[in-house]
């Protein structure tokens, strides 16, 4: 089976600002637009440095990669697609990021059995799915005090 075409993702802030990494283009995977990421991370700026982050429905990895670039202590990426998960691993390797893990798994299944707690959880499920309310219902035990979703 051949790999699908690769798209390009630009990191917009932090230590890897302007670095380009690949993502698998397909299955509705689209990186969160630059403008949205910039706004999101402007809001989150005081909470990123040193945070332990869970990037659910990671897709291209854009949100978690931005968190690492901006000083997160650790990011756990959860992506069900094998090709997408591998592309995130390759991006992390290209960037030299050792403080991350990529788990190829269903987000809801991972939340149901996960024991670790996080400072910040990034949620960007597929647009046409009903996964957001289900994920939000499973989140409380995974969040540290004074957390962000």
Regions found by a protein language model. Name each.
Residues 1-149:
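Class I S-adenosyl-L-methionine-dependent methyltransferase catalytic core
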């Amino acid at each position: 089976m051949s790999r699908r075409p690769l798209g390009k993702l630009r990191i917009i802030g932090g230590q890897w600002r302007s670095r380009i990494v690949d993502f698998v283009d397909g299955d509705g995977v689209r990186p969160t637009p630059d403008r949205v990421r910039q706004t999101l991370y402007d809001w989150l700026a005081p909470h990123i440095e040193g945070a332990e982050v869970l990037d659910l429905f990671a897709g291209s990895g854009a949100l978690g990669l931005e968190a690492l670039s901006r000083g997160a202590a650790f990011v756990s990426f959860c992506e069900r697609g094998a090709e997408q998960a591998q592309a995130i691993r390759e991006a992390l390797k290209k960037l030299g990021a050792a403080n991350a893990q990529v788990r190829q798994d269903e987000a809801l299944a991972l939340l149901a059995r996960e024991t670790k707690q996080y400072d910040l959880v990034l949620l960007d499920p597929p647009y046409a799915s009903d996964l957001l309310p289900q994920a939000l219902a499973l989140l409380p035990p995974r969040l540290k005090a004074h957390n962000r979703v």
